[in-house]
């Protein structure tokens, strides 16, 4: 079905290949999970299969590709659209129509298929993803998870034998992620050939089987290729060394020497686990607030109220996590905090002063903001110029500019990309560039909207280390996130938003131990916390805490 031989590819003006002598065969009905570090070539491989690289992006390509009997290097992209459908990371960048129904029929209409066939395929696709009852809705009325399911429905309506999905849950909350993964599971069940690039490996365990396939890409080359059972039982340490996420159940089992490695929590023999754990002590800190919000309401111009009677305090010199489902109001609240949006009612106090009475330029000199979508803040044509831009605006002298830019390039592993256009970077690389553009300005407060989207394990852990370092040096950090493992590792304080209202403010441990609150807010606790809680240790929220606790008690030798 898919045959790739000696494939190498260079992006325009790139010296190093993004794909390096790739060879693989994928057979009909296979489910293939593609793992790899940020910028390793995962997305590039998918783009090679449908002809986007050769015909839309350009660059240099060598080797042979065959997809359902077609060569994407020589075939037109529109011809490849009958063989393979692609669902991208950001549904907003893929959806083109105003109406749900129009979006699903758009592709088949362009192929001039009979009307009866188009209607039949569209109805079937919408029912398959659970959106048939919303077929007359505007796309703008859908949640983030629904938009991604719509993108999958549009791909299904093309009736291609292969569906490729490039991090389809990157921007989704835990419940939205589960909904999309359930759709992907159903794609497996009806016999579609599915290629999935994904970082959220914990949630994936609900849909993959031991005989499914994993391909690991490292620096553009295939590093590992085998069944799920083979990879997780024999190569878990290799995956860690490559800087990739392991499912927490696999990570715990590997560290404790449990074989064979289970794939699901319900497969762990809880009574057989050593129970000499201890709950880690957490220092109760008393913070003084740097930002206070009092009785804030906010509505957009269409009259829809997004934030309702918000009152909160952002602790100084802390890492505060803002969590909630897609559409709960997190991004809107963050934009209010920096004065880019104005509340209908209420106050935002920065250092005790109403932020709306202050000069916005002066406020933004002290507050750095990293957008959810990095592309929204890029304004130049090279990575170097992007990092330097804010320094130029602030009239920083040339020597100091050069030093700071050099430090940022090194800090975020972007040294070899100085002349790349920001829009040609991978999702993870774009995210790291967006961090660099803000940190180079040395803000007093750093606000980050979904900072770990598209990040591999190595970069996520580095970011956690960096945020802790910045906090210890006096920076106040606010992060909006859907990643509960990330929250567990670095947050001092957590605020939960649900439908524009605050449901909870306090210690992350209290949140993870409140099952009713988690379910109401469409959140979930880390898998390792579930294991520890069954053993009665409710303060253990990370794999490191779980395993080090056993080691300290000399249970593991």
Label the predicted regions.
Residues 220, 499-500:
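Conserved ABC ATPase "signature" C-loop
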Residues 138-142, 146, 421-425:
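Conserved ABC ATPase signature
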Residues 116-134, 399-417:
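Conserved ABC ATPase "signature" region
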Residues 163-166, 446-449:
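Catalytic Walker B motif of ABC-type/P-loop ATPase nucleotide-binding domains
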Residues 58-70, 346-354, 363:
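Conserved ABC transporter NBD signature motif
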């Amino acid at each position: 079905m898919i045959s790739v031989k000696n494939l190498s590819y260079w992006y325009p003006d790139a010296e190093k290949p993004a794909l390096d002598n790739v060879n693989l065969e994928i057979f009909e009905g296979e489910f293939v999970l593609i793992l790899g570090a940020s910028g390793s070539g995962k997305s590039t491989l998918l783009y090679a299969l449908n002809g986007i690289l050769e015909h839309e992006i350009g660059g240099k390509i060598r080797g042979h590709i065959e997809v359902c009997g077609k060569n994407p290097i020589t075939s037109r992209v529109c011809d490849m659209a009958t063989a393979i459908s692609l669902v991208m990371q950001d549904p907003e960048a893929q959806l083109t129509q105003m109406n749900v129904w129009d979006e699903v029929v758009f592709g088949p209409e362009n192929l001039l298929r009979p009307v009866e066939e188009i209607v039949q395929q569209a109805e079937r696709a919408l029912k398959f993803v659970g959106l048939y009852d919303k077929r007359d809705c505007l796309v703008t009325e859908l949640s983030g998870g629904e938009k991604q399911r719509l993108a999958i429905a549009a791909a299904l309506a093309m009736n291609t034998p292969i569906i490729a999905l490039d991090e389809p849950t990157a921007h989704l909350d835990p419940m939205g992620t589960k909904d999309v993964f359930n759709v992907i599971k159903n794609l497996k069940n009806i016999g579609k050939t599915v290629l999935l690039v994904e970082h959220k490996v914990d949630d994936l365990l609900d849909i993959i089987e031991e005989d499914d396939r994993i391909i690991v890409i490292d620096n553009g080359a295939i590093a590992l290729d085998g069944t799920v059972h083979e990879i997780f039982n024999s190569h878990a340490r290799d995956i860690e060394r490559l800087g990739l996420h392991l499912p927490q159940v696999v990570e715990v089992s590997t560290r404790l020497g449990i074989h064979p490695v289970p794939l699901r929590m319900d497969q762990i023999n809880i009574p057989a686990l050593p129970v000499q754990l201890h709950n880690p002590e957490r220092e109760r800190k008393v913070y003084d607030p740097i930002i206070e919000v009092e009785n804030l309401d906010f509505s957009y111009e269409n009259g829809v109220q997004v934030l309702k009677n918000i009152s909160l305090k952002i602790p100084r010199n802390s890492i505060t996590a803002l969590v909630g489902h897609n559409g709960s109001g997190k991004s809107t609240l963050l934009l209010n905090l920096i004065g880019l949006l104005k509340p209908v009612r209420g106050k935002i106090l920065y250092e005790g002063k109403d932020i709306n009475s202050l000069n916005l330029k002066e406020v933004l000199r002290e507050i750095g903001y990293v957008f959810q979508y990095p592309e929204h803040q890029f304004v130049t044509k090279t990575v170097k110029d992007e990092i330097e831009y804010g320094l130029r605006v602030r009239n920083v002298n040339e020597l100091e500019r050069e030093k700071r830019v050099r430090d940022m390039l090194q800090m975020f592993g972007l040294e070899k990309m100085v002349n790349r256009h920001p829009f040609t970077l991978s999702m993870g690389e774009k995210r790291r560039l967006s961090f660099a553009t803000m940190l180079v300005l040395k803000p007093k407060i750093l606000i980050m909207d979904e900072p770990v989207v598209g990040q591999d394990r190595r970069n996520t852990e580095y970011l956690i280390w960096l945020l802790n370092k910045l906090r210890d040096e006096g920076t106040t950090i606010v992060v909006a996130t859907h990643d509960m493992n990330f929250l567990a590792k670095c947050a001092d304080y957590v605020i939960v938003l649900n439908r524009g209202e605050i449901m909870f403010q306090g210690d992350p441990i209290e949140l993870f131990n409140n099952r009713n609150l988690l379910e109401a807010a469409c959140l979930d606790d880390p898998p390792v916390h579930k294991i520890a809680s069954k053993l009665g240790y409710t303060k253990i929220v990370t794999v490191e805490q779980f395993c080090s606790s056993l080691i300290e008690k000399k249970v593991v030798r």
